[in-house]
From Swiss-Prot:
Belongs to the universal ribosomal protein uS5 family. One of its GO terms (cellular component) is small ribosomal subunit. With S4 and S12 plays an important role in translational accuracy. It comes from Legionella pneumophila subsp. pneumophila (strain Philadelphia 1 / ATCC 33152 / DSM 7513). The N-terminal domain interacts with the head of the 30S subunit; the C-terminal domain interacts with the body and contacts protein S4. The interaction surface between S4 and S5 is involved in control of translational fidelity. Keywords: Ribonucleoprotein, Ribosomal protein, RNA-binding, rRNA-binding. Residues 12-75 form the S5 DRBM domain. InterPro entries: Ribosomal_Su5_D2-typ_SF, Ribosomal_uS5, Ribosomal_uS5_bac-type, Ribosomal_uS5_C, Ribosomal_uS5_N, Ribosomal_uS5_N_CS, Ribsml_uS5_D2-typ_fold_subgr. This is Small ribosomal subunit protein uS5. Gene3D superfamilies: 3.30.160.20, 3.30.230.10.
Length: 168
C-alpha cells in the first residue's frame, strides 16, 4: 500500500491513507461514493487526521484535509523520536511504539507510517497488531502519541526532579 503525497499548502505535509469506494443500488443502477482518510502534519510535532465523503474523490480529499487541519494536536518529541515506549488500542487495532536510536528510520507499516512521517518522527520502531483497518490504526496511533508523557510531566506527577526520573 502506498501513500500519496498530496500537494502541499500552508506548510503542512499531507498524506492520503486510504480511498474507499461505496455503491448504493438505486432503480437506475449503482451510485458510487468515495470515502477518504487523510493525515496532515507540520513535521514538527503537530498531526491531525480527517475523513471526507463525496461522490468524487477530489472533493472528498478536500473535505478530509479541512477536517484534519481542524483536528490537529501537538505531540512533544524527544528530538527525532518519542520519549518512551507505549501501547494503545482503538477498537480491534492495537499499536506498539518504541523509541529508536539515531539512524534507525521509521520502522512501521500501514497507516502508522503515514502518521509518523507527517508528525516529524524520524527514528521509531512500531508494530500494529490485530485489525489493520486504516481508520482504527490512525486513531490508535494518534491516541498513543497523545498519551506520551514528557520527562517534565512525569517528574511533576511523581514529585521528583527531572534528573531523578531520567536516572530510573
Amino acid at each position: 500500500m502506498s501513500f500519496d503525497e498530496l500537494p502541499k499548502s500552508d506548510g503542512y505535509q499531507e498524506k492520503l491513507v486510504s480511498v474507499t469506494r461505496t455503491a448504493k443500488v438505486v432503480k437506475g443502477g449503482r451510485v458510487f461514493g468515495f470515502a477518504v482518510l487523510v493525515v496532515v502534519g507540520d513535521g514538527k510535532g503537530k498531526v491531525g487526521f480527517g475523513r471526507g465523503k463525496a461522490r468524487e474523490v477530489p472533493i472528498a480529499i478536500q473535505k478530509a484535509m479541512d477536517q484534519a487541519k481542524k483536528n490537529m494536536v501537538y505531540i512533544p518529541l524527544s528530538g527525532t523520536t518519542i520519549f518512551h515506549e507505549i501501547t494503545w488500542n482503538y477498537g480491534a487495532s492495537k499499536v506498539f511504539m518504541k523509541p529508536a536510536s539515531e539512524g534507525t528510520g521509521i520502522i512501521a507499516g500501514g497507516a502508522m507510517r503515514a502518521v509518523l512521517e507527517v508528525l516529524g518522527v524520524q527514528n521509531i520502531l512500531a508494530k500494529s497488531i490485530g485489525s489493520t483497518n486504516p481508520s482504527n490504526i490512525v486513531r490508535a496511533t494518534i491516541g498513543a502519541l497523545t498519551h506520551i508523557g514528557t520527562p517534565d510531566y512525569v517528574a511533576a506527577k511523581r514529585g521528583k526532579t527531572v534528573e531523578e526520573v531520567m536516572a530510573g
